[in-house]
Design a protein with these regions (language model features):
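Long, positively charged amphipathic alpha-helical accessory segments at protein N-termini or as interdomain linkers
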Residues: 1-29, 35-38, 42-43, 145-173, ...
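N-terminal lobe of the biotin/lipoate ligase/transferase fold
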Residues: 2-167, 187, 196, 239
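A short, compositionally biased micro-patch
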Residues: 50, 130, 176, 298-299
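Short loop/edge segments at beta-strand edges and connector loops
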Residues: 88, 175-177
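Conserved active-site carboxylates
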Residues: 180
Length: 326
């Protein structure tokens, strides 16, 4: 086990541990324990120091564990899921899975990380990924569909994510086209889908999901939009990230199977129920211009429909935002 991971396992119970005990947990000196403790601080973890007691995490952290995730899966997902790989740090769970896909990784392989250095959202934006705080999960999916028919897949995946969140009492969330989950205008989660393969199929799909679970306020200073997290919404209940990962897979896998069979059509009504843009005045930011109008839902390909001064337009790409009211 990685030394930093071993130190985390020692600290994860929320109890105080002396410098000597931390060093001993690594089979090293107190000084070596202090060095790795400093590394955890730099990764964003907060500690309390008790005089004569030692160190403890400011709040206990449940570490991700592949076996705990697998054991929490429903029977169908447990049979379908391939390898579950959990890492302390990665540049990106999706990048790692894309590389594995080229080495014949099986469909429904899963990758998670406690921290990402290169996590990203749409248009290459950084996804803030503090250590052991949120859920960063990517799923590999092999599809026989043509690449052009997979345009609505990220929207269908959003339905799976919404179903997952309801298990944790998050019933007030909405979907913002194409891939954000918002609660009262604040971002809770996001999805990024990468598709590679032949135009006529088959295709390799990597679905990256980021869910804010327990975002440290200090780590959120680089986030440019309003945000929220699961623990804030759940009140006094601390959300288990292992259970959250398993529930997400339980809900996401049947959605992907249904999408392969029938496209986005089976999910249209459910999407419309959660569409936060429907009927709203929006701006669609394109590389060369911005188009304004009233959002009118989506079509069966996943494109956003907007009623503009020049008539109804459909957008398969772009950044949608609610128009500010002057």
């Amino acid at each position: 086990m990685h030394l930093r991971n071993r130190l985390l396992h020692c600290l994860s119970n929320g109890e105080f541990h002396s410098g000597e005990a931390l060093g001993a947990s690594l089979g090293r000196s107190r000084m070596a324990g202090g060095k790795h403790l400093k590394g955890l601080r730099e990764a964003g973890l907060e500690f309390e120091v008790g005089r004569g007691k030692g160190y403890r995490l400011a709040r206990p952290r449940e570490l991700l564990d592949a076996e705990r995730i697998r054991s929490a899966l429903g029977s169908e997902a447990r049979e379908a899921v391939g390898d579950i790989d959990v890492f302390l740090e990665l540049d990106s769970t999706s990048n790692w899975l894309r590389e594995r896909a080229q080495q014949d990784a099986v469909s429904a392989s899963v990758c998670l990380a406690e921290m990402q250095h290169g996590g990203r959202g749409r248009h290459g934006r950084q996804w803030v990924s503090p250590f052991a705080a949120n859920l960063y999960l990517s799923l590999l999916w092999r599809s026989d569909q043509a690449a052009a028919s997979l345009g609505g897949l990220s929207l269908a995946a959003g339905i799976g994510l919404m179903r997952c969140l309801r298990h944790f009492g998050v019933g007030q969330a909405g979907l913002k086209w194409p891939n954000d989950v918002l609660v009262d205008g604040a971002k809770l989660a996001g999805i990024l889908v990468d598709v590679t393969g032949e135009l006529s199929g088959p295709c390799t799909v990597v679905i990256g999901v980021g869910i804010n679970v327990d975002m440290p306020p200090g780590a959120a200073t680089g986030i440019e939009q309003a945000w929220t997290d699961m623990n804030s919404l759940a009140g006094s209940m601390d959300v288990s990230r292992n259970r959250l990962a398993a529930t997400l897979l339980d809900e996401l896998l049947p959605v992907l199977q249904a999408f392969d069979a029938g496209g986005l059509q089976p999910f249209m009504q459910e999407w419309q129920q959660h569409d936060v843009l429907a009927g709203q005045q929006v701006d669609i930011s394109l590389p060369d211009r911005t188009i304004s109008g009233r959002a009118c839902g989506i079509d069966a390909t996943g494109a956003l429909l907007v009623e503009t001064a020049a008539g109804r337009k459909r957008f398969g790409a772009g950044e949608a935002s609610l128009r500010s009211r002057s």
